[in-house]
């Protein structure tokens, strides 16, 4: 089955303190998205679509694209590589972007920018997260079961495997019904492991609500068919129409759209659970830990000495 891996890499890592999407972190300078690409191709994916800022094109081709040119799919074919640009030129003409706005419009707009390149079932992920080998195998198999419209899937991770020792994180806390289907995702903005070993939302105070370690959370690892693009387009336009004049930071987020479609009965999303250790670089201080974990995976033979052909 042909399937596309769509990687969102245009965002600015403000808390991280740099461009974490292209920060070399593997033993040979690999960046985190190279591990996702490697795992996806092994699982059966046939196309990679990078969503980037236009000025990142040369950098991305040099760091990742040129290595992909030598890679093959699981069937021995060449990997199709596409670059989609997320910038303000793709915003509908009826909306005038404030001249002071720098921040991109969020994950709905990002995915919408890849529309012309995606004509097959696809998975969309963050560029700066490590998702684990088995997660790609599981979601690839699930993609083949999706109807042409009205169905999707996601990988849910245990909350305890997704927090940082160096500060709070934002996670999409998933409410899953008895049938293993997603009811809703609640964006929770200040999750932190505390001194007593419990994970709390400390948005209001240090003794905020406690979350169970195995609480399923979304790390933006979604699977859909191209049917979703019509919904993305309509939702983004409604978002822009509702923005106050001069708004500089508000984003249009994929989990919000998915929740609305579920509430309207237009979408059902299966939740695939993963007990894998997710890791990423929310903060610059996370880098050393991620480097250690990746080296362990190479040493254990999960990955070859180098990911670059």
Residue ranges, per PLM feature:
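Conserved N-terminal catalytic core of the sugar/cofactor nucleotidyltransferase
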Residues: 1-4, 27-124, 131-132, 136, ...
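N-terminal nucleotide-binding beta1-loop-alpha1 segment
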Residues: 1-19, 23
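Hydrophobic packing residues within well-ordered alpha-helices of enzyme cores
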Residues: 60-64, 139, 232, 290
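Short, surface-exposed amphipathic charged segments that create phosphate/polyanion-binding patches used
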Residues: 93-103, 167-172, 285-289
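Conserved core of the sugar-phosphate nucleotidyltransferase
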Residues: 133-222
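Conserved nucleotide-sugar donor-binding
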Residues: 221-232
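A C-terminal functional module that forms or caps the active site or interfaces directly
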Residues: 232-267
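Generic C-terminus detector
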Residues: 286-309
């Amino acid at each position: 089955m042909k399937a596309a891996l769509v990687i969102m890499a245009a965002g600015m890592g403000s808390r991280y303190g740099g461009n974490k999407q292209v920060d070399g972190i593997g033993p040979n300078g690999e960046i985190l998205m190279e591990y996702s690409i490697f795992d996806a191709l092994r699982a059966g994916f046939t196309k990679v679509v990078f969503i980037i800022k236009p000025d990142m094109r040369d950098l991305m081709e040099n760091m990742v694209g040129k290595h992909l040119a030598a890679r093959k799919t699981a069937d021995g074919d060449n990997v199709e590589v596409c670059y989609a640009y997320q910038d303000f030129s793709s915003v509908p003409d009826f909306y005038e972007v404030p001249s002071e706005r720098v921040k991109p419009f969020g994950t709905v707009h990002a995915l919408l920018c890849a529309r012309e390149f995606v004509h097959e079932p696809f998975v969309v992920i963050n560029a700066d997260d490590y998702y684990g080998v088995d997660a790609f195998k599981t979601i690839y198999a699930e993609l083949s079961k999706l109807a042409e419209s009205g169905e999707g899937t996601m990988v849910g991770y245990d909350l305890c495997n997704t927090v940082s020792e160096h500060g709070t994180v934002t996670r999409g806390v998933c409410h899953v019904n008895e049938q293993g289907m997603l009811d809703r995702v609640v964006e929770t903005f200040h999750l932190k492991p505390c001194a007593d070993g419990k994970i709390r939302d400390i948005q209001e105070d240090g003794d905020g609500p406690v979350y169970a370690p195995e609480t399923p959370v979304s790390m933006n690892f979604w699977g859909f068919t191209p049917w979703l693009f019509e919904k993305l387009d309509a939702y983004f336009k409604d978002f822009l129409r509702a923005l106050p004049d001069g708004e500089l930071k508000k984003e249009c987020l994929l989990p919000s759209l998915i929740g609305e479609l579920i509430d309207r009965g237009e979408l059902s999303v299966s939740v695939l659970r993963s007990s894998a250790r997710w890791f990423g670089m929310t903060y610059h201080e996370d880098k050393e830990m991620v480097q250690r974990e990746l080296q362990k995976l190479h040493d254990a033979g999960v990955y070859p000495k180098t990911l670059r052909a």
